[in-house]
Amino acid sequence: MKLIIASNNAHKITEIEALLASISIDLPVVSLQEIGDVPEIVEDGTTFEENAVKKVETIAKVAPNDYILADDSGMSVDALNGEPGVYSARYAGDHDDQANIDKVLQKLAKVPNEQRTAHFNSVIALHSPKGSNLIVNGQVDGYITESERGQDGFGYDPIFFVPSMNKTFAEMSASEKNTISHRGLALQELGKKLPVWLKGE
């Protein structure tokens, strides 16, 4: 029995593995690439939760005896009526971080700083071999900067500013980001709920 991370995103897998290490999941962790032939996951849900559940249940069809963890996450900008939301990864087309950043900055070009509020959300679904799902979520609030700042991270990290840290995600170390990020908060919540959930399994 193992824990499969239902993602091909190397950055996301590295981040999740680091966070899983902190909550002591006693299972070997593998990525989708390591389990071979998997069906295509169509992320056509209208919410992060729908997409996360769709990922774990799709992979469960080919790995019914394993635990499967999937995250669906994205950034919602208030001045853009919640965009990019569930379309965060493909906001400007096919998974192009720079194009996505450029599109957000362009759309916010005339929006004053105080109205550039945004939120990063992560919903994590953990699917058990018995077919039940544990759902947790995390949210971090911030602002969209007027230009990119920082060299680390991925996705929208260079333009997502967190006031409590006085930095963008891309200006933070991995450990700083993992402590306060949406995915980090969701995994911390998973760590709290997991022991009780596993007893019920």
UniProtKB/Swiss-Prot annotation:
Residues that coordinate or bind Mg(2+): D72
Top-rank lineage group of the source organism: Bacteria
EC primary class: hydrolase
Signal peptide: none
This protein's GO CC annotations: cytosol
GO molecular function (one): dITP diphosphatase activity
Family as reported in the entry's similarity comment: Belongs to the HAM1 NTPase family.
GO biological process: nucleotide metabolic process; purine nucleoside triphosphate catabolic process
Catalysed transformations (reactions): XTP + H2O = XMP + diphosphate + H(+); dITP + H2O = dIMP + diphosphate + H(+); ITP + H2O = IMP + diphosphate + H(+)
Organism (species): Leuconostoc mesenteroides subsp. mesenteroides (strain ATCC 8293 / DSM 20343 / BCRC 11652 / CCM 1803 / JCM 6124 / NCDO 523 / NBRC 100496 / NCIMB 8023 / NCTC 12954 / NRRL B-1118 / 37Y)
Assembly, per entry: Homodimer.
PANTHER family: INOSINE TRIPHOSPHATE PYROPHOSPHATASE (PTHR11067:SF9), INOSINE TRIPHOSPHATE PYROPHOSPHATASE/HAM1 PROTEIN (PTHR11067)
Native organism taxonomy: Bacteria, Bacillati, Bacillota, Bacilli, Lactobacillales
Coiled-coil features, chain-numbered ranges: none
Database matches in CDD domains: HAM1
Cofactor note: Binds 1 Mg(2+) ion per subunit.
Residues reported in the UniProt entry to bind substrate: S7, N8, N9, A10, H11, K12, S73, F154, G155, Y156, D157, K177, H182, R183
The protein's Enzyme Commission number: 3.6.1.66
Cofactors required: Mg(2+)
Protein name: dITP/XTP pyrophosphatase
